[in-house]
Regions:
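Conserved beta-sheet core of the metallophosphoesterase superfamily
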Residues: 186-268, 275-276
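Membrane-embedded segments
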Residues: 50-141
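Binuclear metal-dependent hydrolase catalytic cores centered on His/Asp/Glu-rich metal-binding motifs
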Residues: 125-138, 144-183, 189-191, 256-260
Length: 280
């Protein structure tokens, strides 16, 4: 009788482990796109209703051309939040991913920490070859119907001890321009003196493994606060009343292709002119 009970318990635990592993593998391999709408007070009228396809932390994964074809014509720009590759990822795979993304829209990208450890020069060349634009502490003007939004790419320091530089200055005539910043590591907000209208970041993977009620298992205090999703804060000295930031869970995975309560994601973000009374 005791032996039968032990066998039943053992079998039950094995089944639970198999199901858990299958779920974690499924979450890590998703091609899901999270749809969001962000209200921006300073957004020019011409940009009202425009969309950004945002993806970060691809790492080793391959994008699906078949899946992303449905987003052609639905995004005005594609923004990559860094870690487009990592060590031992062939540049040919990176090129294939970038070619797929360039079919969705004009690509703008920043380096992530793993890009810098892998092959930054090769990655920069592949970006150029596929029509992408690498932003390294640079501003670029996005233009529609004579109106402009400033897109700023913040460069990733090689090590955290190197620190982040200040945001590149805008021309005097554009000091009140609507500004979108893409930066790999959201820790940048601790050093940025002036917050832009919108920040797009990655790096955290949302913790990748999250436990119910507890959250991310392997994030420090700052990243546990800013782990994934939409965030905003109020700065009395800022001209932007409600600066907003999206931290993506990322498309790829670190070390193992497993996730729990933290599925892989890409983003389609619709920009709307108006008061940022809530985040969607």
């Amino acid at each position: 009788m005791v032996t039968a009970v032990l066998l039943w318990i053992t079998g039950f635990l094995i089944v639970c482990c198999v199901l858990l592993f299958a779920r974690m593998s499924y979450e890590a391999r998703l091609h899901a796109v999270t749809h969001s709408e962000v209200m921006m007070e300073g957004l020019p009228e011409a940009f009202d209703g425009c969309s950004i396809f945002f993806i970060s932390d691809i790492h080793k994964r391959k994008l699906s051309n078949k899946y992303l074809q449905e987003f052609q014509g639905k995004a005005d720009w594609v923004i990559l939040g860094g870690d487009m590759m990592e060590k031992n990822v062939p540049l040919e795979r990176v090129k294939e991913n970038l070619e797929i993304l360039s079919g969705v829209g004009q690509v703008y990208a920043v380096y992530g920490n793993h890009d810098l450890k892998a092959d930054p020069e090769g990655l920069a060349q592949v970006l150029r070859d596929t029509g992408g634009i690498l932003l390294r502490d640079q501003n670029i003007r996005l233009v529609r119907d004579g109106e402009e939004v400033c897109l700023t790419g913040v460069d990733q320091p090689l090590t955290k001890r190197d620190g982040y530089p200040d945001l590149p200055d805008l021309p005097d005539s554009d000091t009140k321009a609507c500004r979108i910043v893409v930066v790999h590591d959201p820790a940048w907000i601790r050093f940025a003196p002036n917050k832009p209208d919108l920040i797009l970041a990655g790096h955290t993977h949302g913790g990748q493994i999250r436990l119910p009620f507890f959250g991310a298992v392997r994030l420090n205090a700052f990243y546990r606060k800013y782990d994934c999703g939409w965030f905003r804060w109020y700065q009395p000295q800022s001209a932007v009343k409600l600066p907003q930031m999206l931290i993506s869970r990322g498309f790829g995975n670190r070390r193992v292709a497993l996730r729990l309560c933290c599925p892989a994601e890409m983003h389609l973000i619709r920009l709307k002119k108006g008061t940022a009374d809530k985040l969607k």
